[in-house]
Amino acid sequence: EAYMNTGIQRSSATPYGAWTTTTPVKHFKERPKKDMEAIMAAHRIPYIATASTGYPEDLFKKTKKAKEIKGTRFLHIYAPCPTGWKSRPEDTVKLSRMVVQNGIFPIYEIEWGEKY
């Protein structure tokens, strides 16, 4: 998890130990990632969801639901970056499913601070 569209830069959501262009090998990310969903839930916004591009039906369902809700909505969508991950583009769907299946990136919804 990083800012892939700006050159694989570290973000507060980048996991501990991750490599990015702004965290060189000798200085990998030394702090745990921020739990962005928990931060949003603490503010009791109307809708928070996590989704993965490996499960497009779930992603579309949550996007549609978010569009129908008034107020602040937060979607954290996991999409592997072949350049940042040094992986093959054809493995993107497989990788995005593996992170969910192995509990690295759980998919869920939170409404008004309550997890479902």
Which functions belong to the PLM regions below?
Residues 1-73, 89-90, 94:
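Thiamine diphosphate
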Residues 59-116:
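Glycine/aspartate-rich loop-and-adjacent alpha/beta segment that forms the canonical ThDP
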